[in-house]
UniProtKB/Swiss-Prot annotation:
Residue ranges with Basic and acidic residues bias: 192-203
Name under which the protein is recorded: Uncharacterized protein C1450.03
SS bond list: none
Any one GO cellular component localisation term in the record: nucleus
Organism: Schizosaccharomyces pombe (strain 972 / ATCC 24843)
Length: 240
């Protein structure tokens, strides 16, 4: 049986292999294992190696690896002299080399797997971002459709076209004013609404109308008032 004293586990010689294996599996503290193996006799280390190596070849548990590591480091010289351990040590070496080779492949696969996962994560983020943009575009299209259904027509007005229309309106207005002015100055121009209204409404009775002789008499009395006499300078020029 094995006994624990402080930080050291004491193994008895010729102890049962199952008890040794159980004790080693229950302890994985590097400090306790190293102190125990250093204070251990070579024969006990050989017995412990005979028990741990076959178990290690079947299932490489971390606690067994710690025990074998310190046994080989501390008592490796003595173990090479034990003949019945040579085959077990060779098998352990082959197993460790194979495990190291597999570990290299595992690390390589792990790196590739991490790269693939990172790419997949980036691709998923892009898909999420594009889906969000698509939803925003659908919302904008839905709003535009609502505006069209409501009957709101949005017309883009060209400023140059507006200026041309304003110039045409001003030209038409000027032409209209000139035509009205010419019509009003012509001898055949119609009377204003107010004057025509007076002419139509005001009718002189026949009994009050003047005869031709009376009209000539009135003209003789009125015309001299509107005749402007010529200046003495003009009369002198005519006499010359």
């Amino acid at each position: 049986m094995a006994a624990t004293t402080g930080n050291i586990i004491k193994f008895e010689e010729n102890a049962d292999s199952k008890d040794l294996l159980e004790q080693c599996l229950n302890c994985s503290d590097v400090g306790v294992v190293s102190n125990t193996v250093r204070n251990m006799d070579g024969t006990i280390a050989a017995d412990l190696a005979r028990t741990l190596i076959p178990a290690m070849l079947i299932n490489m548990q971390p606690s067994l690896a710690i025990w074998l590591h310190w046994i080989i480091v501390t008592h490796g010289g003595y173990l090479t002299t034990v003949m019945d351990l040579q085959d077990s040590l060779v098998q352990l070496h082959e197993k460790l080399v194979q495990s190291a080779h597999l570990m290299t492949k595992i690390f390589s696969l792990s790196g590739k797997l991490n790269m693939v996962l990172s790419q997949e994560e980036m691709r998923q983020r892009r898909l999420d971002f594009s889906s969000e943009d698509g939803e925003e575009e659908e919302e904008n299209d839905y709003i535009d459709e609502d505006v069209d259904e409501a009957g709101y027509d949005i017309e883009v007005v060209d400023e140059a076209e507006n200026d041309d229309m304003d110039n045409d309106l001003e030209a038409n207005a000027d032409a209209f004013d000139e035509s009205n002015l010419e019509a009003s100055l012509s001898p055949n121009a119609e009377l204003s609404p107010r004057k025509s209204h007076i002419d139509h409404d005001f009718v002189i009775p026949e009994d009050e109308m003047l005869s031709e002789e009376e009209e000539q008499e009135v003209e003789k009395q009125i015309l001299p008032k509107f005749v402007v006499p010529e200046s003495p300078r003009k009369t002198s020029r005519k006499s010359r």
